[in-house]
Regions:
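Active-site beta-loop-alpha junctions enriched in small/polar residues
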Residues: 1-3, 28-32, 81, 112-114, ...
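N-terminal hydrophobic targeting/anchoring segments and the immediately downstream early-domain regions
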Residues: 1-38, 158, 227, 251-261
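Active-site gating/metal-coordination segments in enzymes
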Residues: 14-17, 22-101, 106, 157, ...
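Mid-to-C-terminal alpha-helical segments outside catalytic/metal-binding sites
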Residues: 217-261
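Alpha-helical scaffolding segments of alpha/beta enzyme cores, especially the outer helices
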Residues: 10-14, 18, 57-60, 64, ...
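Short acidic/histidine-rich active-site segments
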Residues: 161-162, 186-210, 240
Length: 261
């Protein structure tokens, strides 16, 4: 989660310590319709550079720690809504680029309905971020193969990262799109996951939500249901290992990707 979606650094650290999972916290800001737009709009009335203020916040989270916790973020999260990037969202992208260039931190994005990932990529790379340091998140929100391959050829990672949320886009279409990308030779630039929230501001999940998307809140869903389907489609164990282990390792280590035809 970015800064304005209920991020809890101390809870994440505690979970990581007790489970052994390596949890990488994010800094960043969410899209205009659901994030902290009102606050930043208010700040803009005082003649300050909103991009600089945002970038300073991201850099502090990455280099000094989140608030007074001493826990540092390790990635920048940005977002845009469907079919357009608003001025506010553009400012977030510019601030993220500035912070990434200053610190070397990678960036992951939120997209809606499989749109605007190419525009996000262009804004970030035009402002100095190497393409291989970017994940275009929720790329699995569309089955547009040319959109996927355009992002891949431009050197960024595709986030097929919403498995289990069939009400947004069905898993079978996600699987089909992922298989096409893998068979097109772009399997080294795909990362996979669920898009799950594990703590709802300290309260139980609303029962109605759980009933609608039970797989979204099952951390074994990808292993139990998606991997077998990938195998049925001819995806090898080596390719699956790449999705789960090698690609995330390469992304966070900053290794460059080879050119894609």
């Amino acid at each position: 989660c970015p800064n304005d979606l209920g991020r809890d650094a101390e809870l994440a650290a505690k979970v990581g310590q007790q489970t052994g999972f390596q949890i990488i916290l994010a800094t960043g800001l969410y899209k205009q319709s659901e994030g902290a737009y009102a606050y930043w709009h208010f700040r803009s009335n005082f003649g300050e550079s909103i991009v600089d203020l945002m970038a300073d916040l991201f850099i502090a989270d990455l280099t000094e720690g989140i608030g007074d916790t001493g826990i540092k973020a390790g990635i920048i999260k940005v977002a845009s809504g469907p079919n357009e990037i608003t001025e506010y969202e553009n400012n977030i992208l510019l601030a993220a680029a500035k912070a990434s260039v200053a610190t070397g931190a990678p960036i992951t994005t939120h997209t809606d309905q499989g749109t605007m990932g190419d525009a996000q990529q262009k804004i970030l790379t035009d402002n100095g971020v190497p393409a291989h340091r970017i994940i275009i998140g929720h790329s699995c929100g569309t089955d547009n193969h040319e959109y996927h391959m355009g992002l891949a050829r431009s050197g960024s990672y595709l986030g097929f990262d919403r498995f289990g949320i069939d009400m947004v886009f069905p898993d079978e279409k996600r699987i089909s799109s992922l298989v096409k990308v893998l068979k097109a030779g772009a399997g080294d630039r795909v990362v996979v996951s669920h898009d799950s929230v594990w703590c709802w501001k300290g309260q139980p999940f609303p029962p109605g939500m759980l009933a609608q998307v039970p797989d979204a809140f099952d951390p074994t869903h990808f292993e139990r249901k998606i991997i077998p389907r990938l195998r049925e489609e001819g995806i090898s164990a080596e390719q699956i290992e790449g999705l789960l282990v090698e690609n995330p390792r390469r992304f966070f280590s900053g290794e460059k990707l080879s050119a894609l035809a």
